[in-house]
Regions:
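Sec-dependent bacterial lipoprotein signal peptides
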Residues: 1-22
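Gram-negative (and chloroplast) outer-membrane scaffold detector with strong preference
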Residues: 81, 86-87, 92-179
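Outer-envelope beta-barrel architecture signal
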Residues: 26-27, 54-62, 73, 85-87, ...
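Outer-membrane beta-barrel biogenesis signature
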Residues: 22-61, 261-265
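Flexible, solvent-exposed coil segments and beta strand-coil junctions
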Residues: 55-59, 84, 88, 92-94, ...
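Outer-membrane beta-barrel proteins
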Residues: 33, 74-76, 80-81, 90, ...
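Solvent-exposed loop/turn segments connecting transmembrane beta-strands
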Residues: 63-79, 94-108, 121-123, 165-168, ...
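Outer-membrane beta-barrel transmembrane domain signature
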Residues: 142-250, 254-265
Length: 265
């Protein structure tokens, strides 16, 4: 009886092993990370146009906006000041991330500052052009590790705008060109994340890229406070295959005032 029981037990174990080997269900941890997961990690994020459209000496502006686009959402603060009739200063800081509510795939922050020329072309028409430099960092959280992208850039940003007499309604067109230098450091598994590896290799081979970011700016409200919104696209003129955020939509508020002291006659 014991011998028969052993034989029956062996047959059952063998059948279970055979059936298990024939199971074609999903694999919980595939060797190769799906490309869709790898594409949650991005290597460049554009900021919204820092085009506050100030026009008078000693004008000061502050913007606070929520921004978002393909593969990111964030917050931006911008400031500008006209210390002279035709001279302007700008600065901007942006930060954000790409997540799905339970997993964070990317975080970034970026700072830019510049100086520019400002003039009124005719009644209601405004022109400005700013140039400056910036720096930033992108941290990607891959399925098998991490990557860090350090960015430095210089830019030029001309803009035309039209406004009503009180400058409580303004519409502008901006065209920003940036030269961006990428420096990448990685710790993820190159063999398992082939798409991400190809992106990193392309940045090592060509670390300097020219970006073109045309956009529209619209703001309306009162003399000292305006609702502000903008939309811009981002095109990589050096390597269109670089996986990046390709647009930026922002909405928020803008404070405006003039720092000139009033003289009582």
């Amino acid at each position: 009886m014991k011998k028969n029981s052993l034989i029956k037990g062996s047959i059952i174990v063998a059948c279970m092993g055979f059936l298990h080997s024939c199971y074609f269900g999903p694999i919980s941890d595939p060797y190769y990370v799906p490309e869709s997961r790898q594409q949650e990690n991005v290597y460049y994020v554009p900021s919204s146009p820092n085009t506050q459209l100030l026009s008078e000496k000693n004008d000061i502006g502050f913007d606070l906006v929520a921004s978002g686009g393909s593969k990111f959402s964030g917050v931006e603060t911008q400031a500008s000041f006209l210390p002279a009739k035709h001279v302007g200063l700008i600065a901007g800081y942006s930060s954000g991330k790409n997540d799905d509510g339970s997993n964070t795939y990317m975080k970034f922050h970026k700072f830019e500052g510049g100086v520019g020329y400002v003039t009124n072309l005719s009644k209601g028409w405004h022109f400005e052009t700013y140039g400056g430099v910036g720096t930033g960092k992108i941290d990607n959280f891959h399925a098998t590790g991490n990557s860090k992208v350090d960015l430095t850039n210089f830019f030029i940003q001309p803009a035309f705008a039209v406004s009503n007499k009180r400058k409580t309604v303004q519409f502008g067109i901006v065209s920003k060109f940036s030269g961006v230098n990428f420096k990448v450091d990685t710790t993820f598994d190159n063999a398992r994340e082939l798409y991400s590896t190809s992106q990193v290799i392309s940045l090592h081979d060509q670390p300097f890229h020219i970006m073109w970011e045309p956009g529209l700016v619209f703001q309306f409200g009162w003399k000292s406070f305006l609702f502000h919104t903008s939309y811009s696209l981002s095109a990589d003129l050096t390597n269109s295959q670089l996986h990046r955020a390709t647009d930026n939509f922002s909405i928020g508020g803008a404070l405006r005032f003039n720092a000139s002291k009033k003289v009582i006659q």
